């Protein structure tokens, strides 16, 4: 863990309220796929998961939902390229088990996708042959982000597939990530779950009922 400043390189709008912030990665800053950093705003600290792979040495990325009036959100909303931002980290025990050979199931809702994206990129960039399935849930079509990136990755890597589900669509299929995973064969899987508490609890219970032991069910509540 270290205190450091990182220069903001770029800001990309992913949805109406989600932004991708890319920072220069300072020398000596290392992390495991799935961990988070604390953004320092005066006397207040806010936790944000790193959404990039540790193998990306030049930069690191945060995916942030901007909340009206939120200290971290308002600070980042006003941030401009070349600004230096104060951080502390990395933190967290929600990270990839690199020694496992089990299939990987990534389940996320909203910006709970961020640490899962880090894990996904790391696995694919490191040449892992483990089967990887991603299940991503949001409310509306306009809340979906990174779809094109997932489509591109799934075309390049035969061991990766993904599904996106909407809980409040204007039309078409409606459901939750818990509905999606019930259709899957997860016997030899390791689950990484990140999102709201109700979803995390439901998915944990499902994997437990399927006989997956606790050490193979990793979770973080957003």
Question: Where are the language model's segments positioned?
Answer:
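Short, conserved phosphate/pyrophosphate- and ester-handling motifs at nucleotide-, phospho-/glycolipid
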Residues: 34, 112, 196
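Histidine-anchored nucleotide/phosphate-binding helix
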Residues: 113-125
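Conserved S-adenosyl-L-methionine
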Residues: 101, 122-132
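Phosphate- and divalent-cation-binding pockets in alpha/beta enzyme and binding domains
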Residues: 95, 115-118, 145, 202-203
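Reductase modules of NAD(P)H-dependent flavoproteins
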Residues: 135, 139-222
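A short, basic/flexible loop-to-alpha-helix module at the beginning of a structural domain
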Residues: 89-101
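Ferredoxin-reductase
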Residues: 2-83, 139-140, 168-169
């Amino acid at each position: 863990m270290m205190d450091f400043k990182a220069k903001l390189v770029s800001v990309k709008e992913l949805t109406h309220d989600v932004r991708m912030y890319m920072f220069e990665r300072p020398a000596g800053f290392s992390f495991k796929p799935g961990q988070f950093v604390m953004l320092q705003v005066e006397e207040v600290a806010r936790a944000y998961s790193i959404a990039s792979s540790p193998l990306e040495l030049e930069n690191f990325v945060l995916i942030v939902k901007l909340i009206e009036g939120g200290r971290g959100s308002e600070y980042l909303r006003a941030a401009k390229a070349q600004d230096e931002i104060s951080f502390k980290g990395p933190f967290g025990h929600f990270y990839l088990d690199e020694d496992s050979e089990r299939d990987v199931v990534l389940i996320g809702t909203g910006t709970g996708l961020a640490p899962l994206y880090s894990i996904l990129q790391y696995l694919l960039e490191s040449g892992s042959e483990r089967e990887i399935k991603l299940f991503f849930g949001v409310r509306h079509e306009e809340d979906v982000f990174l779809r094109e990136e997932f489509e591109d990755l799934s075309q390049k890597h035969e061991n990766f597939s993904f599904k996106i589900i909407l809980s409040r669509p204007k039309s078409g299929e409606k459901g939750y990530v818990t509905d999606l995973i019930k259709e899957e064969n997860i016997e030899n899987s390791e689950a990484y779950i990140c999102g709201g508490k109700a979803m995390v609890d439901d998915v944990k219970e499902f994997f437990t009922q399927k006989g997956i032991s606790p050490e193979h069910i990793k979770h973080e509540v957003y």
